[in-house]
Amino acid sequence: MLHKQTPEDVITRQLYHKLADETLTDLSEQLDKELDGGYADYKDGNLQIKIDNVGEYMFNKQPASMQIWASSPITGPRKFDICRRHEWIDLKSNTSFSRYIEEELRRMRSKMAGKHKK
């Protein structure tokens, strides 16, 4: 019988918190620099991003499952698990967190550009 690997098999809870906090802090800082017509607020493991003409994004630490959950007004909810290489992966779509953010930024910019043309 195959053993399904759980996040606990890969990292400790202490390392989970460190990596999740670093990821969300870095994302908050990146978006604070890039956002025009919006803001990012990170506290207590929750990152809230509001963008004019796009909507609200939420990123939350989920310590019980050792995940980061994301909610997008464009693409909906996602759950990211940490893997051995300390990279966050959406196991359902096999998409890395960094790739997901790149795609969301592209979609967000496209949506914002479309709103400005009207």
From Swiss-Prot:
Main location per the UniProt record: other
Signal peptide coordinates: none
Cellular component aspect of the GO annotation: mitochondrion; mitosome
UniProt subcellular location: Mitosome
Gene Ontology BP, a term: iron ion transport
GO molecular function, a single term: ferrous iron binding
Gene3D superfamilies: Frataxin/CyaY
Keywords assigned by UniProt, alphabetized: Ion transport, Iron, Iron transport, Mitosome, Transport
Family: Belongs to the frataxin family.
Role according to the record: Promotes the assembly and repair of iron-sulfur clusters by delivering Fe(2+) to proteins involved in these pathways.
Subunit-level organization: Monomer.
Protein name: Frataxin, mitosomal
Organism: Encephalitozoon cuniculi (strain GB-M1)
